[in-house]
Amino acid sequence: MDRNPSPPPPGRDKEEEEEVAGGDCIGSTVYSKHWLFGVLSGLIQIVSPENTKSSSDDEEQLTELDEEMENEICRVWDMSMDEDVALFLQEFNAPDIFMGVLAKSKCPRLREICVGILGNMACFQEICVSISSDKNLGQVLLHCLYDSDPPTLLETSRLLLTCLSQAEVASVWVERIQEHPAIYDSICFIMSSSTNVDLLVKVGEVVDKLFDLDEKLMLEWVRNGAAQPLDQPQEESEEQPVFRLVPCILEAAKQVRSENPEWLDVYMHILQLLTTVDDGIQAIVHCPDTGKDIWNLLFDLVCHEFCQSDDPPIILQEQKTVLASVFSVLSAIYASQTEQEYLKIEKVDLPLIDSLIRVLQNMEQCQKKPENSAESNTEETKRTDLTQDDFHLKILKDILCEFLSNIFQALTKETVAQGVKEGQLSKQKCSSAFQNLLPFYSPVVEDFIKILREVDKALADDLEKNFPSLKVQT
């Protein structure tokens, strides 16, 4: 499809073309005001009272968009990415026209395009503030989240994310969403049933942004699915509450993973945000099946998907944020619910140790600075990039080390012996682990050395030679 909008239709004489060049252009663009007026007028006609009171015979026409009108309004959609055009649409009260279309039209394609144009316009701060301050428009847009048309839902989610990302108006939208409990149900339904990965990712970004902006809203949504049998007093109930939000997040994550695991970042971060509050952790681990499924998904990601032994170390730069979220959630589940069957030490500890150490080793490679760089970036740009990389890698390292220390504390003599035999606790890997755990986790490493000495005294002695501080303290 041609994404570059065309000027007004041909057929004008030279005098008319000069008029367009002289005063009919929108801002500094070549787009015609007169042509745009015509398209918007056509939109008004579509939703005018005489057209909306059609008989049942015309129902099909109401849900289909005329090809010529679709082409023209799509050009406006393209054009609205230009700030001059967006401002002109704002001055012409185009948002009110689009609101009328959304309130009255049953045509999915037309609704999608109108929300898409508003989404483009909202990318500019002044217009975003204006759109957000219109209560009626806000209500109509939120109502679009109840739509059954995936493209319309996608554009609505994109618009919401744009507004939520503007600090000046974000709180307005959070408050509106809190006032509409049905939005929670709609979003849960999308996450649990949609196979449209683009939509799932965008809805996930909206949820992630909402939770990041407002912990109260996150807690409300987490608690929203807690169901208690009406005929059973809560204090006598042995049934665990059913949390709807977490299973829906899990279903969305599975669907996204099936198409592209690299897009999982947003759903992993949502789970990470949930683990920052006690109710969020409980929502994960106190639903046995869901907790097990989440653990299995994340366990499989770190053991068989991300940052594998045959991947180049530099892959860590692409995967550092998703790995931080995944390991953070695994660590929270591991620390809070160790009695669960799926967390039995002999089943998970050695594969996790192997994955944790592998990521730490790749991190060491990534942080090695090349002596001579052929890149032409300025020193200031390089310094900024390295600072950002170091920041994210430091967050990841802190998460890895805390998780690794918790696993080390739970190791038994039998598990250590198995790890030495199978290679997860080789001299090289233990050295990498110690190098990262010391000095902050010295007591944990010292206790591990004591167990290791019972299993393989020579290996324990070699490690103590490489880390003299351990020998002094033991």
From Swiss-Prot:
Tissues where this protein is expressed: Highly expressed in testis and ovary, and to a lesser extent in the lung, spleen and the heart (at protein level).
Which stretches does the entry tag as region Disordered?
Answer: 1-21
Instruction: Tell me the residues on which Phosphothreonine occurs.
Output: 387
Comp. bias intervals (Pro residues): 1-10
> Quick one: a GO cellular component term?
nucleus
Location of this chain's protein in the cell = Nucleus
List S-S links within the chain.
none
Keywords for this entry? Nucleus, Phosphoprotein
Q: Does the keyword Flavoprotein apply?
A: no
Family, according to the entry, reads as follows: Belongs to the SAAL1 family.
- Protein purpose: Plays a role in promoting the proliferation of synovial fibroblasts in response to pro-inflammatory stimuli.
Record-given protein name:
Protein SAAL1
Q: Which organism is it from?
A: Homo sapiens (Human)
Q: Which gene encodes it?
A: SAAL1
